[in-house]
Amino acid sequence: MARAFAAPPAFVDITWMSISNMYYEIGSLDVVTDGYITRLPQDAFFGGGGGYAQTRRPFPPDVAAVTRVMNALGQPSRVGLLLTGHSHWDHSFDTATWSKLTGARIIGSRTTCLQAQAEGIPAERCRSVNGGEAIPLAEGVTMRVVRWNHSGDPALNPEQHNPVELNAVPVRDPATGGLRAGVAEDFPNGGGNRAYLFIVDGLDGRFSWFFNNSASAVDLHVPIVLDGVNYGAPLENLKSAMRDAKLASVDLWIGGSAAPVAKLVVPVLKPKAFLPVHWDGLFGAFEAGVQKPYADAGVEDFLKASGVAVVKPAQYMDKWRLDRTGVRPIANTEVKKVLGFN
């Protein structure tokens, strides 16, 4: 059955919910990207080049914490789509919980879908994407999937960087109901990464944004090959998505803060503004909020020289409105008040 869409939206409201957790309000559709609210302890991880290969014990998601954030956002039934860029614990650990609470469908890697099945989500509720897909989300709104890579270096932390997918549904611990969160356990990256290019042909004109939650300058130009299948080089995949969408530039880039990556991506993306994410740490309590302000002189200097405005988040649940005229901050007073961020 074809899905009925409302009129095209004139804007999207974008909320940063910590790490690379984003909340998009696109007309009548609300989208949560990543949505990792549970905080696992740092001392649970060990091994590998990055120190995150294995865990000392399994962990269940913090359902109460996710529920609290969901309720603070209001109208939980509006959350109709969950996206994951990649499938490490700090991105997809709570995806199944959001889906249970909202009934929202999931789009991500095969690994994300298998993780969700382990948590009891029906297989048909999760769509596995490999890159190159153009998916209509709402009237006038298209999301293009860009196969991407993960941060790191194959010579230094291959278990974290190299593309790896799960091949079977992971088994939950019978005592705790939890999964093993290590990147060499139940939470590999899911075949590298998925970036998302959003294009809105709105009531007042066209606008767009690009989201990626990790990247490595080391091999952003090298094809991603998994199980004998070549998924293309990330930079070439981005060029293809931009070309297919008939975009010469985007209005906003949401991504990690790394100067070597920015120097490769900006010439392709030509963003008007940049919103840095995934700079606030992995292990601090969500309720404690941002502990130190964003600062990355290398990125900021390069972007300024390139004519790209830097939109600096200051606190969790900061919110912006993006439309054809650009991006600007808007108040999110009630949500912040409920979560204690005022």
Describe the function of each predicted region.
Residues R105, C113-A138, P267-N342:
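Binuclear metal-ion centers of metallo-dependent hydrolases, dominated by the metallo-beta-lactamase
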Residues A2-P9, R110-G205, Y316, T333:
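Metallo-beta-lactamase
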Residues A4-F5, L29-L83, H88, F93, ...:
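Pre-active-site segment of Zn-dependent metallo-hydrolases
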Residues F93-S99, L264-V265, K270:
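Histidine-anchored nucleotide/phosphate-binding helix
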Residues D13-W16, V31-D34, T142-N149, F207-S216, ...:
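Active-site-proximal beta-strand elements of phosphoester/diester hydrolases
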Residues V32-Y36, R78-H88, I107-R110, W209-A215, ...:
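Active-site neighborhood of phospho(di)ester-bond hydrolases with catalytic His/Asp-centered motifs
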Residues L179-L269:
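Active-site-proximal loop/helix segments of hydrolase catalytic cores
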Residues S20, L40, H88-S92, C113-A116, ...:
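Active-site environment of divalent metal-dependent phosphoester hydrolases
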